[in-house]
């Protein structure tokens, strides 16, 4: 486990240790990534994982290695790999994946996330074509497309999303497309205008945690802005289901989670995912509690009582986990 402390003011003492040289062109992971955020992560005793936290390995004879090979051949990334998702064995084994576009270097440094930070490479103009060909080759009926944050782009990457959606529909017209988008902070109006030309079948943007914890968990993001993204998209496309997700175990209370769920419904969010946060490494935010299955069951009951069309709630649930089943249950066919 780890604890959090405010970053100290740099010392003028010549004896103070100098920080490692920072090369923005290189992908920073783990300690290299979190070393420069306002909240520092300090190693401490780990909580013991309870018996209900179990990761499923890929089954013998599954498509796990075949999927990895195809992704590398087409120069594609998945959030499953980059974020060290615990469900990767199960999902790859079943022939499903969440594709991550616009590179593997994020402009943010969220200390819960295992995606690398750095100066992103220029957009790959062949990526929409490569993505569409791969999805067609895999004969996928439902795909999730996500991305790193691209604060370096004037539209946050919205046009690239639209190009990818269009190409996938060209090659696989019956495939349903969910996008899990960044917050487009500072570029929201431009991004929404661009997305208007080619909206997905499901629009997903994760709030991740409660507003009180945004400073430590989502530096560079804003809770109210994320809600605005979801509700403004819904106003433009009332027929498209909207979706958001939360992770538990960062220090939130149950009542804070319930209030976020109410906020989602007040902003016309249709679908919900809630799962247990698992620390990718000792240099990431600590797990402060493992939520009991009974508590997850309570959140699920409350979600349906609030009017969510579908709620996937459980320790190993992730935003894209069984996304096709979630969408089908919410009426996306």
Curated annotation (Swiss-Prot):
Signal peptide (residue range): none
SUPFAM superfamilies in alphabetical order: Radical SAM enzymes
InterPro entries (UniProt xref): Aldolase_TIM, Elp3/MiaA/NifB-like_rSAM, LIAS_N, Lipoyl_synth, rSAM
Textual note on the cofactor: Binds 2 [4Fe-4S] clusters per subunit. One cluster is coordinated with 3 cysteines and an exchangeable S-adenosyl-L-methionine.
Residue ranges annotated for the Radical SAM core domain, each copy included: 91-309
One GO location term (cellular component): cytoplasm
SMART domains, sorted: Elp3
E.C. no: 2.8.1.8
Keyword Transcription regulation part of the UniProt annotation: no
Source organism: Bordetella parapertussis (strain 12822 / ATCC BAA-587 / NCTC 13253)
Pathway(s) it belongs to: Protein modification; protein lipoylation via endogenous pathway; protein N(6)-(lipoyl)lysine from octanoyl-[acyl-carrier-protein]: step 2/2
Subcellular localization, as worded in the UniProt entry: Cytoplasm
Chain positions recorded as [4Fe-4S] cluster 1 binding sites: 80, 85, 91, 320
Biased composition, class Polar residues, residue ranges: 1-15
Positions of region (Disordered): 1-34
Family: Belongs to the radical SAM superfamily. Lipoyl synthase family.
Catalytic activity: [[Fe-S] cluster scaffold protein carrying a second [4Fe-4S](2+) cluster] + N(6)-octanoyl-L-lysyl-[protein] + 2 oxidized [2Fe-2S]-[ferredoxin] + 2 S-adenosyl-L-methionine + 4 H(+) = [[Fe-S] cluster scaffold protein] + N(6)-[(R)-dihydrolipoyl]-L-lysyl-[protein] + 4 Fe(3+) + 2 hydrogen sulfide + 2 5'-deoxyadenosine + 2 L-methionine + 2 reduced [2Fe-2S]-[ferredoxin]
Protein name: Lipoyl synthase
Keyword entries, A-Z: 4Fe-4S, Cytoplasm, Iron, Iron-sulfur, Metal-binding, S-adenosyl-L-methionine, Transferase
Pfam families associated with the record: LIAS_N (PF16881), Radical_SAM (PF04055)
